[in-house]
Amino acid sequence: MKAYKGTDKDMKCRGMQYVLGETAVYDGELSLCHAGLHACEQPIDVLNHYAPCESRYFEVEADGVSDERGSDDSKIVAKKMMLKAEIGIPGLVKAQVEYIKKQIGF
């Protein structure tokens, strides 16, 4: 599943070190907001979790995604996640426009 992820400036998130182009794997039980590898289906939602001045933003491929979803944004939790490309804020905005177009069938 295509999704979007924020990390800190060192490409870490909740103790997990990510490497561009490599697949991160979580071995435990998944729990949204508590355990697993997290990202957002809707690009702009990433800003709810990672402030622009201290973060990096990526397009990711998530596998082993739980059916669990939050009520306040499009956050997902997965067993495997690969950072495909660093896109920054301009990439998030562009991806958000494409996301909306897809949702409305444009």
Task: Enumerate the language-model features and the residues they cover.
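Short, glycine-biased loop/turn motifs at secondary-structure junctions and
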Residues: 1-106
